[in-house]
């Protein structure tokens, strides 16, 4: 039986959260559930961050890809996927042990949550950041 870890993404820096979760998934001994994905933050200026995500989303053709998600849970999952060897069996197995949610789902209400101290937003030297939910809404998501 795999150990279950529930991580609350509220106030955690997206990249640092993703790298920590990727390491946990590659160790192979636990399932990871991330809740409140829309409250994860991206450091940097609001305008530059929104522009980068919009340009990434508009890249390529709608029929042929690359396909980039709008919803915050999917953006977070895609970010973690970029840190895994997802085209190999080890990476596919790691991705299958990951679940990301907007808000808190019914089955995880009351579950003990863990935070990642290295990814806390209080470690930022600047107060410039944007929440993942806001980026998602600016790209047209209706989560």
From Swiss-Prot:
GO molecular function terms attached to this record: mRNA binding; structural constituent of ribosome
Keyword annotations of the record: Ribonucleoprotein, Ribosomal protein
One cellular-component annotation, GO: cytosolic large ribosomal subunit
Disulfide bond annotation, renumbered to this chain: none
GO BP terms: negative regulation of translation; translation
Keyword NAD found: no
Coiled coil spans: none
Keyword Ribosomal protein among UniProt keywords: yes
Complexes and interactors: Part of the 50S ribosomal subunit.
Family membership: Belongs to the universal ribosomal protein uL13 family.
NCBIfam families for the chain: L13_A_E, PRK06394.1
PANTHER family reported for this sequence: LARGE RIBOSOMAL SUBUNIT PROTEIN UL13, RIBOSOMAL PROTEIN L13
The protein's role, per its UniProt record: This protein is one of the early assembly proteins of the 50S ribosomal subunit, although it is not seen to bind rRNA by itself. It is important during the early stages of 50S assembly.
Protein name: Large ribosomal subunit protein uL13
Gene assigned in the entry: rpl13
């Amino acid at each position: 039986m795999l150990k279950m870890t529930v991580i609350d993404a509220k106030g955690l820096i997206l990249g640092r959260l993703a790298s920590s979760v990727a390491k946990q998934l590659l160790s192979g001994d636990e399932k990871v559930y991330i809740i409140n994905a829309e409250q994860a933050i991206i450091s940097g200026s609001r305008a530059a961050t929104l522009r980068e995500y919009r340009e990434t989303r508009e890249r390529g053709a709608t029929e042929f890809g690359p396909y980039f998600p709008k919803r915050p849970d999917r953006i977070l999952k895609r970010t973690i996927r970029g840190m895994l060897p997802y085209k190999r069996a080890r990476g596919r197995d790691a991705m299958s042990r990951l679940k990301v949610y907007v808000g808190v789902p019914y089955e995880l209400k009351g579950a003990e949550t863990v935070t990642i101290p290295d990814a806390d937003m209080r470690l930022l030297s600047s107060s410039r950041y944007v929440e993942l939910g806001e980026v998602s809404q600016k790209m047209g998501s209706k989560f």
